[in-house]
Amino acid sequence: MATEKSVTPTEEQLEILEYNFCKVNKHPDPTTLCLIAAETGLSEEQTLKWFKQRLAEWRKSEGLPSECGSVRD
Protein backbone atom coordinates (compact mmCIF):
# COMPACT_ATOMS: atom_id res chain seq x y z
CA MET A 1 0.00 0.00 0.00
CA ALA A 2 1.66 3.21 -1.16
CA THR A 3 1.44 6.32 0.97
CA GLU A 4 2.43 9.79 -0.12
CA LYS A 5 5.54 10.98 1.67
CA SER A 6 4.99 14.05 3.79
CA VAL A 7 6.70 17.01 2.14
CA THR A 8 7.59 20.22 3.92
CA PRO A 9 7.07 23.15 1.54
CA THR A 10 10.07 25.34 0.81
CA GLU A 11 10.07 29.01 1.81
CA GLU A 12 9.16 29.99 -1.76
CA GLN A 13 6.30 27.48 -1.87
CA LEU A 14 5.03 28.75 1.50
CA GLU A 15 5.04 32.33 0.20
CA ILE A 16 2.85 31.27 -2.73
CA LEU A 17 0.53 29.23 -0.50
CA GLU A 18 0.21 31.99 2.12
CA TYR A 19 -0.42 34.65 -0.53
CA ASN A 20 -3.22 32.59 -2.03
CA PHE A 21 -4.67 31.80 1.39
CA CYS A 22 -4.60 35.37 2.70
CA LYS A 23 -5.19 37.45 -0.42
CA VAL A 24 -7.04 35.22 -2.88
CA ASN A 25 -9.21 32.54 -1.27
CA LYS A 26 -9.19 30.46 1.91
CA HIS A 27 -11.39 27.88 0.12
CA PRO A 28 -9.95 27.44 -3.39
CA ASP A 29 -12.10 25.60 -5.93
CA PRO A 30 -10.60 22.55 -7.69
CA THR A 31 -9.39 24.59 -10.68
CA THR A 32 -7.67 27.19 -8.49
CA LEU A 33 -6.20 24.44 -6.32
CA CYS A 34 -4.77 22.81 -9.46
CA LEU A 35 -3.21 26.12 -10.55
CA ILE A 36 -1.69 26.72 -7.09
CA ALA A 37 -0.31 23.16 -7.08
CA ALA A 38 1.25 23.72 -10.50
CA GLU A 39 2.75 27.04 -9.40
CA THR A 40 4.28 25.56 -6.24
CA GLY A 41 5.33 22.23 -7.73
CA LEU A 42 3.38 20.37 -5.05
CA SER A 43 0.75 17.76 -5.80
CA GLU A 44 -2.91 18.74 -5.64
CA GLU A 45 -3.29 16.44 -2.62
CA GLN A 46 -0.39 18.13 -0.80
CA THR A 47 -1.79 21.56 -1.66
CA LEU A 48 -5.28 20.64 -0.45
CA LYS A 49 -3.84 19.20 2.78
CA TRP A 50 -1.88 22.42 3.36
CA PHE A 51 -5.01 24.56 2.83
CA LYS A 52 -7.05 22.39 5.23
CA GLN A 53 -4.37 22.59 7.93
CA ARG A 54 -3.88 26.32 7.40
CA LEU A 55 -7.63 26.94 7.56
CA ALA A 56 -7.82 25.04 10.87
CA GLU A 57 -4.94 27.18 12.24
CA TRP A 58 -6.64 30.38 11.06
CA ARG A 59 -9.99 29.38 12.56
CA LYS A 60 -8.31 28.59 15.90
CA SER A 61 -6.53 31.97 15.89
CA GLU A 62 -9.91 33.64 15.28
CA GLY A 63 -11.45 31.79 18.23
CA LEU A 64 -13.54 29.53 15.99
CA PRO A 65 -13.77 25.74 16.02
CA SER A 66 -11.10 24.25 13.75
CA GLU A 67 -13.81 22.49 11.74
CA CYS A 68 -17.32 23.76 11.20
CA GLY A 69 -19.63 24.78 8.40
CA SER A 70 -19.90 28.18 6.82
CA VAL A 71 -21.80 30.97 8.49
CA ARG A 72 -24.89 31.78 6.46
CA ASP A 73 -27.68 34.33 6.84
Curated annotation (Swiss-Prot):
Protein's name in the database: Homeodomain-only protein
Pfam hit, one: Homeodomain
GO biological process annotation, one example: heart development
One Gene Ontology MF term: histone deacetylase regulator activity
Annotated localization: Nucleus; Cytoplasm
Keyword Lyase attributed: no
InterPro entries assigned to the protein according to its UniProt record, in alphabetical order: HD (IPR001356), Homeodomain-like_sf (IPR009057), HOPX (IPR039162)
Residue ranges of coiled coil: none
Gene: HOPX
Source species: Gallus gallus
The protein's role, per its UniProt record: Atypical homeodomain protein which does not bind DNA and is required to modulate cardiac growth and development. May act via an interaction with SRF, leading to modulate the expression of SRF-dependent cardiac-specific genes and cardiac development. May act as a co-chaperone for HSPA1A and HSPA1B chaperone proteins and assist in chaperone-mediated protein refolding.
